[in-house]
């Protein structure tokens, strides 16, 4: 596969475009002219940061996935959008895909509003664990690796996430 990244800075790992997601005109042009098979949206504002930055979370978590779907609607380009299992609060359990998304935090609600539900595009709803390019990242693996001594955590908890490697394989199959 030919893979191109989109980030604020060009990547040292893959060919990429440096641009801000708020520059929707440039992004629309890049996607339209690129004639891509798939656009994978991994942009998002996570948990606590979303709670402190409602406007940013609303744009990136809620509006932006629908912007991508709109840009690609008259093309063969499919959008694969990353959501989260946090759209469900977990209070009831045994959720199905079509259940009401009862997450209660701003993060949960902003991610729920961003989910794409149509015949063309795909929303992957999960949590992930894996290496983080940012040494100060808030991911589960980074958190675990920075702990010293006894680690506080949960008991009798079920986690439905997958590794970043498995997520990449899932995305490849979905594309």
State the predicted function of each range.
Residues 21-62:
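NAD(P)H-binding glycine-rich loop region in Rossmannoid oxidoreductase-like domains
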Residues 8-25:
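Rossmann-fold cofactor-recognition segment
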Residues 1:
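N-terminal Rossmann NAD(P)H-binding glycine-rich loop of SDR-like oxidoreductase domains
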Residues 66-102:
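Conserved Rossmann-fold NAD(P)-dependent oxidoreductase catalytic core, especially the SDR/UDP-sugar
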Residues 104, 116-166, 172:
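NAD(P)-dependent short-chain dehydrogenase/reductase
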Residues 6, 42-43, 79-85, 124-126:
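SDR active-site strand-loop-helix element
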Residues 49-55, 90-93, 134:
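Conserved catalytic-core motifs of eukaryotic protein kinase domains, centered on the activation segment
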Residues 22, 52, 56-67, 101, ...:
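Glycine-rich NAD(P)-binding loop of the Rossmann-fold in SDR/ketoreductase-type enzymes
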């Amino acid at each position: 596969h030919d893979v191109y990244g989109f980030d604020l800075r060009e990547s040292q790992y893959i060919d990429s475009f440096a641009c801000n997601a708020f520059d929707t005109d440039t992004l629309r042009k890049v996607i339209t002219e690129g004639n891509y098979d798939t656009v994978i949206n991994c942009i998002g504002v996570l948990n606590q940061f979303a709670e402190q930055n409602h406007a940013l979370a609303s744009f990136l978590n809620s509006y932006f996935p629908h912007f991508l779907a709109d840009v690609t609607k008259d093309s063969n380009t499919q959008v694969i959008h990353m959501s989260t299992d946090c759209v469900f609060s977990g209070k009831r359990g045994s959720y199905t895909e079509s259940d009401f998304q009862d997450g209660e935090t701003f993060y949960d609600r902003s991610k729920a509003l961003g989910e794409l539900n149509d015949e063309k595009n795909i929303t992957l709803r999960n949590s992930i664990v894996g290496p983080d390019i940012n040494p100060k990242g808030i991911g589960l693996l980074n958190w675990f690796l920075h702990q010293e001594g006894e680690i506080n955590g949960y008991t009798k908890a079920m986690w439905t996430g997958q590794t970043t490697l498995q997520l990449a394989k899932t995305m490849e199959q979905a594309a």
